[in-house]
């Protein structure tokens, strides 16, 4: 049986691009954080039972995407995996791309700093911690002098993304979001905004109590909406190779 295509709703119109010189490329100092979870926790499976759960399939999906980011772009890539999987399949790439490839690996269930997530069933909240942890542990982000960090869900590769970023001056951009405000496979920000956009405590902070039973997508949206519009880069819709989504189905664009 073929998985249903999950994103068949009408594509949101993209805002017209202004002041983009097609002949100019910007040297933005961007780092991509690819978030991965090979072994899903039972509490997450119970909360999202339709998600891809087979470990082998999840590994294959991640490996395919990670290799494309490495072989088909020149971007600094930080892979973060939060279930203890070490990606032995990438030993060759770790050496070949050592100047711009790094893995931050940990097991959330045994990491004391993540103990507050023990009873949390929100997949997004666990991911926010992994983004925070990856940035804190990363040596590559510091060594590459990256000042703009973009989280991309690890299973997805976006062929157009690097060229898109080159056409935009990110020096005055505080946050980057997908074309659909309530999607969060792609979320980025200037490093000065990192602790605001990707705060590890997320729903647990008093000022976000109203979001306690909501999705991380809503929190991201409201945070980015609070920033000046001229300082937010809204991405176009990116076509991607059909990829199994984390919540099931097949994703064909982001």
Where are these regions (language model features)?
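ER/Golgi luminal nucleotide-sugar-dependent glycosyltransferases, focusing on the catalytic module
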Residues: 23-254
């Amino acid at each position: 049986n073929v998985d249903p295509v999950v994103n068949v709703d009408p594509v949101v119109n993209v805002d017209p691009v202004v002041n983009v010189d097609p002949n100019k490329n910007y040297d933005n100092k961007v780092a991509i954080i690819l978030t991965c979870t090979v072994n899903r926790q039972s509490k997450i499976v119970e909360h999202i039972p339709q998600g891809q759960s087979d470990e082998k399939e999840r590994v294959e999906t991640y490996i395919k995407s990670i290799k494309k980011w490495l072989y088909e772009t020149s971007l600094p890539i930080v892979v973060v995996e939060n279930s203890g999987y070490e990606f032995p399949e990438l030993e060759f790439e770790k050496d070949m791309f050592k100047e711009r490839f790094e893995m931050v690996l940990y097991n959330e269930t045994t990491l004391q700093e993540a103990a507050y997530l023990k009873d949390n069933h929100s997949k997004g909240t666990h991911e926010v911690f992994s983004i925070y942890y990856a940035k804190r542990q990363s040596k590559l982000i510091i060594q590459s002098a990256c000042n703009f960090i973009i989280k991309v869900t690890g299973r997805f590769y976006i062929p157009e993304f690097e060229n898109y970023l080159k056409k935009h001056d990110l020096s005055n951009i505080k946050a980057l979001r997908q074309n659909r405000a309530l999607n969060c496979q792609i979320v980025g920000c200037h490093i000065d905004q990192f602790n605001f956009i990707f705060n590890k405590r997320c729903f647990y902070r008093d000022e976000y109590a109203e979001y306690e039973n909501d999705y991380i997508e809503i929190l991201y949206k409201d945070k980015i909406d609070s920033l000046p519009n001229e300082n937010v880069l809204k991405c176009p819709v990116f076509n991607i190779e059909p990829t199994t989504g984390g919540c099931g189905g097949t994703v064909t664009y982001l």
